[in-house]
A protein has these predicted regions:
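Alpha/beta enzyme core
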Residues: 2-18, 26-43, 55-188
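Conserved, carboxylate-rich catalytic/transport cores that coordinate ions
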Residues: 23
Length: 189
């Protein structure tokens, strides 16, 4: 109803964990059901895509692609850099042959999201972004710029007390990575 009301596209995002209790075929039909429901509400051409979030193996991504997903995220950020490049490139080649878009990941975010967790973060190196995007051909890229996954974004010792409000304030975020990438790789993402 919301996509019809605001006339906006919808992304139905599925975690790897959701695949454990709802197989890819069921998820595909749920997405198709959402399209049909939007049509019943009067949306002539609903733009609804089905996206896998944090797929960590080629096999998981391939299964989703074969089941009709519109896009997949291959998260090889837990791997050494060259292995992440190789895995992402393999997924991209398979996905693009099936008209499916691919999101890669570079750098490690602290926190917990779905089954992905880390106690530390590794900021993404701008030079690696350029190399990674060029070598893998990924359509979009999740990078680590100081943000974190999950409900607990910062520990108390990372925050400062605002003297005016008495509330804890998280540290400022630095987006130098984005500026460097934009300067060296025009048009990406």
């Amino acid at each position: 109803e919301a996509c019809q009301e605001v006339k906006a596209p919808v992304i139905l995002q599925v975690s790897k964990g959701a695949r454990q209790y709802a197989n890819a075929t069921l998820l595909r039909y749920m997405a198709q059901g959402a399209v049909e429901y939007a049509k019943e509400l009067g949306c002539e051409n609903p733009q609804i895509v089905l996206h896998l979030d944090h797929g960590d193996t080629f096999e998981t991504c391939k299964s989703c692609i074969d089941s009709g997903f519109s896009s997949v995220m291959i998260d090889g950020s837990h791997l050494p850099y060259e292995e992440n490049v190789a895995l992402t490139k393999k997924v991209v080649e398979y996905a693009h042959a099936h008209d499916v878009t691919v999101e890669g990941e570079l750098g490690v975010l602290a926190g917990v999201e779905d089954e992905v967790s880390s106690d530390h973060h590794t900021y993404t190196n701008p030079e690696e972004v350029i190399d990674f995007a060029t070598r893998t051909g990924c359509d979009s890229l999740a990078i680590s710029i100081g943000t974190s996954h999950g409900a607990y974004k910062f520990t108390p010792e990372q925050c400062t007390l605002d003297p005016q409000t008495g509330k804890m304030v998280p540290p400022p975020l630095a987006f130098y990575v984005l500026k460097a990438v934009e300067e060296k790789l025009p048009g990406f993402p």
